[in-house]
UniProtKB/Swiss-Prot annotation:
Swiss-Prot/TrEMBL catalytic activity: holo-[D-alanyl-carrier protein] + D-alanine + ATP = D-alanyl-[D-alanyl-carrier protein] + AMP + diphosphate
Gene Ontology biological process terms, A to Z: lipoteichoic acid biosynthetic process
Stored InterPro entries: AA_adenyl_dom, AMP-bd_C, AMP-bd_C_sf, AMP-binding_CS, AMP-dep_synth/lig_dom, ANL_N_sf, DltA, DltA-like
EC number(s) reported in the record: 6.2.1.54
PANTHER family: ENZYME, PUTATIVE (JCVI)-RELATED, PTHR45398
Cell compartment(s), UniProt: Cytoplasm
One Pfam family here: AMP-binding
UniProt similarity note: Belongs to the ATP-dependent AMP-binding enzyme family. DltA subfamily.
Function per UniProt: Catalyzes the first step in the D-alanylation of lipoteichoic acid (LTA), the activation of D-alanine and its transfer onto the D-alanyl carrier protein (Dcp) DltC. In an ATP-dependent two-step reaction, forms a high energy D-alanyl-AMP intermediate, followed by transfer of the D-alanyl residue as a thiol ester to the phosphopantheinyl prosthetic group of the Dcp. D-alanylation of LTA plays an important role in modulating the properties of the cell wall in Gram-positive bacteria, influencing the net charge of the cell wall.
Residues the record lists as binding D-alanine: 198, 302, 495
Superkingdom in the source lineage: Bacteria
Full protein name: D-alanine--D-alanyl carrier protein ligase
Length: 508
């Protein structure tokens, strides 16, 4: 059982100072460096006249300096808010407005201003890291204090900041280190998801808590299949963490198999549905490896259920279950009145336990709608539809609302609609998902009533709309296809009939 995340990680700087903690394309950093960098930053933050316990935005990509900054912020007694370099400027601006952070630490150059918020620039940060200090980490984040805050999609175009406390994270990491997963000692783990995506917590903190090494794959590599396929066999990893969608890309490379990556023993998936096809293909490529399907919203700290996908499981299930609840967590399946439903009946998944967030940062209205207390434990309305069988095995069946998962990213269709409505060439629009036969979202399609325009073709109009949207929203939220209509169907009460459009896109 972990008492404190920071103390656990810092201990490795004493017991194995020269062990590599971070490797990005052959450039390595040690546990001693991690402690020295994070101590130096914490010492510097302590000298600044910053509001106590207010969070700090950390802007950057997949680098060692990002990890060191996270730990330095936490050592100073504050939560960090990770924002990836590939975020649109507007997202950085909105998060800064919502979070009201004590400061912004720019590990990479900021692409836009952040008003009056104090900023530590990349050059200043480098100088801080280079300053030796003798730091006493005596006021690190602990207990119910926020450890990190990750912003997810919001229905009005305003993202929601999910507050994850130190104890939330400990509950999660303790589970990851348990026999449920059987992770190797000092794991060599793939670190591929961006740090602003809570799936990254699945590789970062269990690995650091076990004194292992993170092997980072930057976005520049993962976006270029040639570079990616060349890099994969060079990684001496034994633990793989990614979305199923990223695995689907890697499986396009025939040489991605146990023969060329003989050290790989564990595959962990989260963020979206793991299809039977993906799991079966992976099992053929890596017959002796252990494959785990996990499930959980960001609001419950990464994941709360797991199941090992064995040959027997593949033979038994056409649509893979999401698994069993972790030992300290209770999951109920309820109807629209909040009453528990019989085993095997579909209902909303209610998640209660010590890894459930206290709510959304500076958003009491949304917090009150989604979070409550259940028998003395914090609980969360997941909005996910599922079933539970008599043995406590859970299956995922979809969303209560119009929220989808695509390529591991959670997207609220209403937020996409919000941005579409702001686009200058659009009169009316709605975004809907396209599912494949494995019930996985493969595409987001925008049904659009355009304003009168002079574009020579639909293609030219689409190009102009997409270009505008790139400055307003995350790339993964932009619809892949645009279908132009003279009008959209309406419900009897005058709202756009989204369900009928979804049926049109997904004929049975």
């Amino acid at each position: 059982m972990i008492k404190n995340i920071i103390t656990t990680i810092d201990d490795y700087a004493r017991t194995q100072p020269n062990n590599v903690v971070y490797d990005v394309q052959g450039v390595t950093h040690t546990y001693a460096e991690l402690k020295a960098y994070s101590d130096a930053l914490a010492a510097h933050l302590d000298t600044l006249d910053l509001p106590a316990k207010d969070p700090i935005i950390v802007f950057g990509g997949q680098t060692f300096e990002m990890i060191a900054t996270f730990l330095g912020v936490v050592k100073s007694g504050r939560a960090y808010i990770p924002i990836d370099t590939h975020s649109p400027n507007e997202r950085l601006t909105m998060i800064n407005e919502i979070a009201k952070p004590a400061a912004v630490i720019a590990v990479a150059d900021l692409p836009t201003g952040v008003g009056t918020t104090p900023v530590i620039t990349p050059d200043q940060l480098a100088a801080i890291f280079a300053t030796p200090v003798d730091y006493q980490a005596d006021h690190v984040v602990s207990g119910d204090d926020n450890y990190y805050i990750i912003f997810t999609s919001g229905t009005t175009g305003m993202p929601k900041g999910v507050q994850i406390s130190h104890d939330n994270l400990v509950s999660y990491v303790d589970w990851m280190l348990s026999d449920d997963f059987g992770l190797p000692d000092q794991p060599n783990s793939l670190s591929q998801p961006p740090y602003s995506f809570d799936l990254s917590v699945m590789d970062v903190y269990p690995t650091l808590a076990l004194g292992g090494t993170l092997y980072a794959l930057p976005k520049a590599v993962t976006d270029d299949f040639k570079q990616l396929f060349a890099a994969l066999p060079t990684l001496p990893i034994n633990v793989w963490v990614s979305t199923p969608s990223f695995m689907d890309i890697c499986l396009l490379e025939p040489k991605f198999n146990a023969e060329n990556l003989p050290t790989l023993t564990h595959f962990l998936f989260c963020g979206e549905e793991l299809t039977h096809k993906t799991a079966a293909t992976l099992k053929k490529r890596f017959p002796d490896a252990r494959i785990f399907n996990t499930y959980g919203p960001t609001e419950t700290c990464v994941a709360v259920t797991q199941i090992e996908i064995t040959d027997a499981a593949l033979a038994q299930y056409d649509r893979l279950p999401i698994g069993y609840a972790k030992a300290d967590t209770r999951i109920l399946v309820v109807d629209e009145n909040g009453e528990a439903v019989p085993n095997g009946t579909e209902g909303e998944l209610i998640i209660a336990g010590p890894s459930v967030s206290k709510g959304y940062l500076n958003n009491s209205e949304k917090t009150a709608k989604a979070f409550f207390e259940l028998d003395g434990q914090p609980a969360y309305h997941s909005g996910d539809i599922g079933t539970m069988d008599a043995d406590g095995l859970f299956r995922y069946r979809g969303r209560v609302d119009f929220q989808i998962k695509m390529h591991g990213y959670r997207i609220e269709l209403e937020e996409v609609d919000h941005f579409l409505a702001q686009q200058q060439h659009i009169k009316q629009a709605v975004a809907v998902p396209k599912y494949d036969k494995e019930h996985k979202v493969t595409q987001m399609i925008a049904y659009v009533v355009p304003k009168p325009n002079d574009f020579e073709s639909d293609f030219a109009l689409t190009t102009a709309i997409k270009k505008d949207l790139q400055g307003m929203m995350m790339e993964y939220m932009i619809p892949q296809r645009f279908v132009y209509q003279t009008s959209l169907p309406l419900t009897p009460n005058g709202k756009i009939d989204v369900k009928s459009i979804i049926k049109e896109v997904n004929p049975e």
